[in-house]
Amino acid sequence: MPHLVLDKISIHYDGQPAPAVERVSIDVAGDDFVVLVGRSGCGKTSLLNVAAGLVTPARGSATINGRPITAPGSDRAVVFQNDALFPWLTARENVAFALRLRGVRPAERARRADELLALVKLGDAGDKRIWELSGGMRQRVGLARALAAEPQFLLLDEPLGALDALTRERMQTTLLDLWTASHAGVLMVTHGIEEALVLATRIVVLAPGPGRVVRTFEPGFSRRYAAGEPIRAIKADPAFATARGELTDAIFEGETA
């Protein structure tokens, strides 16, 4: 099974007197959906960037399947809050572009692009240009393009942060469906407490000054969704409210620890 490991990671930025992150360890297996939460400045995105190969840690090691992570690679796909799509292309052409980079033959690109768009529930939007799509639809295209690389791990940096509440909830189901269908491990950053509880197999709570792990949770709600339980029913469960309170307390307690 694929395995991504951040081991005792410390990150220093030039001009900063203190480390941004100090001795943080996180592991993500191929069937994990790991979510990083915590207030701004605790190093969530910095750690994601180490996993992506965009930041080199001052100390510690980052590996994927035992190999050092030194640069971006096709075994990882990154989706940010602000999409990096080509607005002059259609949704299908954006996904097909990623397939072209993989060397997929022209005759197969459109078919495969349509399959990926259908997977993110955009099967009828292939001919629409990106500027015609809503924020939620654009994020779906971004996810489809990321999956075109057939990565072992999806790295998601607040991909739902700019969406309205209803679209955000719909996208949560999309992310869970993709996680189940793609068999890719996920490492995600979010500020949303409910979002973390719904999506994660494991939640890592970080605190600032410098960034460090203060607690981990294994809420189990994503497994319930995978077994067929609707998200609305999960959120209505008193156990979900209890978990939300515990996670909120852990974040606040981490700020004062």
UniProtKB/Swiss-Prot annotation:
It holds the Pfam family ABC_tran. ATP binds at G38, R39, S40, G41, C42, G43, K44, T45. Keywords: ATP-binding, Cell inner membrane, Cell membrane, Membrane, Nucleotide-binding, Translocase, Transport. The lineage of its organism: Bacteria, Pseudomonadati, Pseudomonadota, Alphaproteobacteria, Hyphomicrobiales. This is Taurine import ATP-binding protein TauB. SUPFAM superfamilies: P-loop containing nucleoside triphosphate hydrolases. It is found in: Cell inner membrane. The complex is composed of two ATP-binding proteins (TauB), two transmembrane proteins (TauC) and a solute-binding protein (TauA). Its EC number is 7.6.2.7. The gene is tauB. It catalyses: taurine(out) + ATP + H2O = taurine(in) + ADP + phosphate + H(+). Residues 6-233 form the ABC transporter domain. Transmembrane segments: none annotated. Gene3D superfamilies: P-loop containing nucleotide triphosphate hydrolases. It is a peripheral membrane protein. The keyword Amino-acid biosynthesis does not apply. It comes from the Bacteria. One of its GO terms (molecular function) is ABC-type taurine transporter transporter activity. Part of the ABC transporter complex TauABC involved in taurine import. Responsible for energy coupling to the transport system. GO terms for cellular component: plasma membrane. It comes from Mesorhizobium japonicum (strain LMG 29417 / CECT 9101 / MAFF 303099) (Mesorhizobium loti (strain MAFF 303099)). Belongs to the ABC transporter superfamily. Taurine importer (TC 3.A.1.17.1) family.
